[in-house]
């Protein structure tokens, strides 16, 4: 198969989305559920529903990407390996929180649901102007600002130089000031620990810094003997003889360490402000435009950018060769950035402080800007008739916030006014002439219009002027003035006489005369009212307008910096990749420098069948794991529930995914919300475990339990997809897919697509390769050899599975547990072996060496087989 065909298979839309059921008939293997749901469609009514069933993977980065988890900086690979214990695929995790952004571009802390490890043959390497470097899978989405001003998630393979990558403007500072952290900053900057003599020296030409280092050393290490030394031919230093200080730097791996290996130790992170100030005092310089920190350690440079982001300071990394050696320059430039650096970190070094203060007064207009979607902003301006005339396509961050905030204030006023105008325009201005005839005498008295004139109006011999018409309506208890005024305001402010005239098929001057004069053309005035009501409805339901308003809200509130992409390059090889699954927002902050990276079927099918083409208007999808809590969910529900369903439906549907992520208190609040809107809203709650849903909610719902699918149901769907995609699906390949899927259709489809990337012929060999599973016959053979007493051959087979096939020990144990029940041995031995497998699995979880433990388990098999 050609490389070109392989790439198409890898990069196209995931098949789990492509073949997601659109109708109830398409749902596989859940006939008992489909039958009940179809009954709801037929009757047009339904109770609240609770969908319970197992979960379903994401886009990935390389392991060297940095990520802040639970307030500490990790390499992504290190973090995932620690949680998964080397296992490939998804591993559930609890209590792990990472930083990400919400829909308004604001930084939030999110719970990670599971970590993920996989392999990839292709990666996309992205470099930016500020020195960021990301290696991600081709279909990994990144949040970018495009040249046309659009802000959108774009697959890595579709990125182009000139696109601007979303970068968090602020990260939470990891800790406050700390004398030990400050001492470490000085030591790593200009200190040295002599491994031979076990003494520490601090070399610096600034007397105040040497004095500060001596004060800290005396305070932190009571056993220290300290001496300041002034030399004739080299820089002065501070000599420290302290067992405690030596043991500290030695325990941190900093004794005798070369400059290209230094890093920020954990104790430095605990007082990162103090560490950075001391480190910058030693190793940073101030040139004509920026503060520049030079280090030979890429690890240190990347950590410093994360630490600076904790104080809202954006920096960039540049490589520089000096006499054949690579150095990394962390650069802080731009007036706003430097000002924040001085206020949050600062210099103790007086000369550096004074030079930086001068730079603050020289702003750089080329930094900290973004491309704006002028076409979309202009559309909002023209649709709502806003007073705005800036036609520049690139704005600074400050300008974007200021202008969008001013526009949003005006937009909120206009939308509120439009809602009020709509309410006024929704009332007809036509009166009941029969009622007027019956009450003619009374109306004459109230209005001062002669009774005979009223009779002429009734018989149609004369038409009343608008002024008299309003008086008559008022006498009948109808106030027309708000409606007439609303018509005039809308025509002047939000539409035009010409637009209304085109709709009416008349001249704009005629419309103006009818609207603005004491006209007698009441029927034409009523037609204008209907047209204006239609136009105002079009404005308020205008999807492009909503998109534009959302865009302006994002500009006014986001906490992002936009870093220009300078290079996009494809890499080929055998890569191990990692991901964190963040439910709800599906993104987190990662990279060598902080960057924003990305990561329901039955409910959607039911909504489509119940509401037809109006399903989008009557269906709201929310995620219960939203970090902002039940109050935000409740507000969205209120906003959605206050309008009537479209298309004749008697209720709307709110789909609440991951409902079991809610706390008990939040579920109680949800119960009250469900009761409050039970008249016109039905809730569908989706969860992995119905036992985690409180009884009061369960009792209000019809419960649907989605069971693992039967092999024949999965096989039918897999054959259909394979035929549709032009694949040759062998029977062995199909059976292998069924084996690894274990009743999960989503997993089966993912495995099929991954195998198709290798070859259009789907064989069992390719399936087991992409699924990171051993062949079941290999596992059975290994266990059989051990039971027959051939321990060395069984051990050789184990090593083949672990090393050649690249599986983890836990993967092998899981398959052994599955296959032990297929062995031709007595039941009591199966029970004993299953118990042993469980025992050794616990040992691996506790961190024991997997090769030793698995060989010991095979030894147990050999003993039991005798």
Swiss-Prot record:
GO cellular component, one term: DNA replication factor C complex
Highest taxon of the lineage: Archaea
Post-translational modification comment from the UniProt entry: This protein undergoes a protein self splicing that involves a post-translational excision of the intervening region (intein) followed by peptide ligation.
A single GO molecular function term of this UniProt record: endonuclease activity
SUPFAM superfamilies: Hedgehog/intein (Hint) domain, Homing endonucleases, lambda repressor-like DNA-binding domains, P-loop containing nucleoside triphosphate hydrolases, post-AAA+ oligomerization domain-like
The keyword Ligase is annotated on this UniProt entry: no
GO biological process: DNA repair; DNA-templated DNA replication; intein-mediated protein splicing
Assigned keywords, A-Z: ATP-binding, Autocatalytic cleavage, DNA replication, Nucleotide-binding, Protein splicing
UniProt subunit comment: Heteromultimer composed of small subunits (RfcS) and large subunits (RfcL).
Functional note: Part of the RFC clamp loader complex which loads the PCNA sliding clamp onto DNA.
Note: The intein interrupts the potential ATP-binding site.
UniProt protein name: Replication factor C small subunit
Organism: Thermococcus kodakarensis (strain ATCC BAA-918 / JCM 12380 / KOD1) (Pyrococcus kodakaraensis (strain KOD1))
Gene: rfcS
